[in-house]
Structures are given as C-alpha cells and as structure tokens.
C-alpha cells in the first residue's frame, strides 16, 4: 500500500507502526511534518517537512486564536500534500494526528482517500480535568466554559472529515461526544515489555547528584513529564512528611522537569514544585528526597527495576506511558482512584488505589507495600501480567495494522 502519515513532530506515536510496515517490505511510506524527525526512521520512509507561511493576526478575539493557529497549520500541511499529489502520489490511506490542525483539509486534497485519525482527548468543560481539582480551579463560569468549548472546532471538523478514528484507552474514548464513539477504535500504542521488564539481578544506579540506589533499599518512585498538579505533584509532595514518619528509611525519587508545565495552568508564583515544597518546609528530611529532573529512558527503566513502590496520580486525563512501563517492570503501584487509572489498575488485584487528594492515604499505601513484601510481589506480578495481556507492543502494532487495512479497504468507515 501507499501510506501517508501526518504528525507535526514526526514520527510521534507512529514509529512502531512504521518499523513494522518497513519490515514487510511492500509499502510506500511517506510522512509529512513540521519538525525534524525526532527518532531514526526506517530506510523506506520518505519524510517531507514543510513550514508555516504566516503567523497569527494581531487583534483577534482570544477565544479564536487557537482555531486560527490550527487553520494556519492545516493550510500548510494541505499545501505540502497537494505538492505530493502534483508529483503523482496518491495514498491508499492517510493516518495522522490531528491535535495541531494538520488533518483538517487532507480529505479535500484527496477526496476519495480514506482518512484514519489518532484522537487523544476531547476537551470538556465539566466532568473531566478542568473542574476536577477545586483547590486550584475555582468554579467554572460561562466564560470559562465558552473558552474551553472553543478548543473543540478543530476536533469536531476532523472527526467529520475522518473515515475512522483510534484512541489509546476506553477513558479517552469516553471524552468524545457519544455520537462519534462508534467510529473510534480503542488500541493502545503499546509498551515494549522486553525493555520494560523486571530485572533478575537489579543493578545499583547512581544519580546525577551522586546518590547511589541499591537493590533492596526502600526506593519509592514518582514520575511526571513535568511536575504539575495534573499529575498529582501537590499530593505527592504533601505526602512526604507522612511517609517519612511511617518509613524514615524510604528514599523518594521524583522524576521529571521542575520548570514550566506540560498540562494545565502555569504556577502563578514561580514553579509548582517550589510552592508545594514550601508548604512542608521543616517537616521532612530533604536528604531522602531526590529530584532527578528529566532522565533518558535507558536510565529510567533501571530505576523502575529498583522501585519497591511506584506512585502514579492523575486528573481524569490522558494516561501516561510511565504508569504502564512501571507495571511492565513489575512495580507495585499506588495509583489514584481516577477513571484513567481505574481502567488499568483494580484495587488490591494489580495495585492499590487511593484518593487523589489524600496525601495521608498515599503515604499509608506506600508504607503498606514497603512493609508487606509478599503483597508487593503479588501486585507487581499481576501488574506486569496486565500489561502483557493488554498492552504488549507487538500485539498493539498488529491491531493497528489490521485496523489500517480495514479502513483502507473500505470495510469500515466507508
């Protein structure tokens, strides 16, 4: 088949699919994106970059600026696609990520070509992330709801222009309007369960600050891409004094960027990490809390292999790969009892679930795992089994390829 992949940060989530298609050796693989490829591409992939010809117009109503940005990107992507068309390229299937607008007009370039879109999340003013945390978000008024609603025109237009869609989890599918859910398949990107696996003989790890983590120590891990409330950094930091009272020998590793945000609002006073640490100043031993910053993935897995308890907290939002990687490594997990986590973790079966807003509950659950090695082993083994059964990379890729065949052939979405 002739396949066109679209992602502003190519290849993004499509890298494993591209590798599998390359291995089959019978496809023409073309990619379009703005940024340089962020990973080594298979040799058969032709990747073309395009630029933006204009920026946002000054003076626009702030609620439509996001839509204008996406239209600018969509126009640029469609122009690049049209150049490919003029050169004689017509794909059998277009598969792309619509999050930045690029997918809006591709069905106008090739009206008869099926379009499959990777849908991550639909913005809703109520019932999901925006109104979840009353401490950090006052009650939404009509203007807040209107501003959030104006994030959705690109999503709605892309849904209309797509023959079929795919999203990684049932929770993410549930964020979309009900009338569209019947055309959204649930297939996860997949976890490399060979790389993310328990170590038979875990090795000591030396952190950048010189701290040595040794097998058998009471190591607790907590991971955010960026330390922010969306991923429970405030609850975790507030749990530190409780944890150290219960388990003074525990070593807590907090992994992730400490400046800015990936999701949600920026901190109004400095950085979120510093604001919440100031709350517990004088109540904990900082020598046993290690902020590692971002670390390379090949250093991240050995840390998970040493972890005696892994904490994952999130608003009702997109599920992080880091949770599934921790589970794949056999970590005993303390997770928030929020919908995306509850889809993966069942309390006392393959992890422990706690109230997102309760630092004490988090500390007590960690302590339970540190003290009850038999329970921790049982939960960690079950956690890995969950990932092997539902999220193994090879299986997920094969399901993606099968879906692509169905959409390309017109068997679904026609």
Please state what every model-predicted region is.
Residues 315:
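Aromatic "clamp/platform" in nucleotide-sugar-dependent glycosyltransferases that forms part
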Residues 208-231, 237-242, 252-255:
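Conserved donor-binding/catalytic core segment of Leloir-type glycosyltransferases
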Residues 1-46, 412:
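N-terminal subdomain of nucleotide-sugar transferases
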């Amino acid at each position: 088949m002739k396949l066109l992949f679209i992602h502003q940060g190519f290849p993004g989530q499509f890298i494993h699919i591209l590798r599998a298609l390359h291995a089959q050796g019978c496809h023409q693989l073309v990619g379009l994106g703005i940024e340089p490829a962020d990973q080594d591409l298979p040799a058969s992939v032709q990747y073309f970059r395009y630029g933006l010809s204009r920026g946002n117009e000054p003076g626009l109503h702030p609620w439509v600026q996001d839509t204008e940005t996406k239209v600018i990107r969509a126009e640029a992507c469609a122009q690049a696609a049209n150049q490919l068309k003029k050169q004689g390229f017509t794909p059998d299937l277009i598969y792309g990520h619509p999050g930045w607008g690029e997918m809006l007009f591709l069905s106008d370039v090739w009206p008869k070509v099926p379009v499959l879109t990777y849908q991550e999340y639909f913005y809703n003013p109520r019932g999901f992330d925006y109104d979840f945390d009353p401490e950090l978000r006052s009650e939404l008024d009509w203007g807040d709801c209107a501003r959030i609603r104006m994030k959705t025109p690109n999503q709605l237009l892309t849904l209309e222009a797509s023959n079929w869609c795919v999203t990684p989890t049932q929770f993410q599918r549930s964020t979309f309007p009900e009338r569209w859910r019947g055309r959204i398949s649930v297939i996860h990107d997949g976890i490399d369960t060979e790389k993310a696996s328990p170590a038979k003989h875990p090795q000591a790890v030396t952190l950048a600050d010189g701290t040595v983590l040794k097998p058998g120590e009471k190591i607790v891990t907590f991971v955010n891409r960026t330390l922010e409330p969306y991923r429970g950094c405030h609850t975790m930091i507030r749990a530190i004094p409780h944890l150290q009272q219960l388990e003074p020998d525990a070593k807590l590793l907090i992994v992730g960027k400490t400046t800015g945000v990936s999701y949600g609002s920026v901190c109004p006073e400095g950085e979120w990490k510093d604001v919440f640490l100031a709350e517990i100043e004088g109540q904990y031993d900082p020598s046993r809390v290690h902020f590692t910053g971002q670390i390379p993935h090949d250093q991240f897995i050995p840390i998970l292999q040493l972890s005696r308890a892994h904490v994952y907290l999130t608003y009702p939002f997109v599920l992080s790969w880091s949770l599934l990687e921790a589970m794949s490594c056999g970590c005993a997990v303390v997770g928030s009892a929020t919908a995306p986590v509850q889809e993966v973790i069942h309390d006392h079966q393959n992890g422990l679930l706690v109230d997102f807003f309760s630092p004490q509950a988090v500390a007590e659950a960690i302590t339970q795992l540190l003290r009850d090695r038999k329970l921790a082993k049982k939960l960690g083994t079950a956690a890995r089994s969950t990932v092997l059964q539902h999220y193994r990379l090879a299986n997920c890729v094969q399901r993606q390829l099968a879906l692509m065949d169905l959409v390309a052939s017109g068997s679904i979405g026609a």
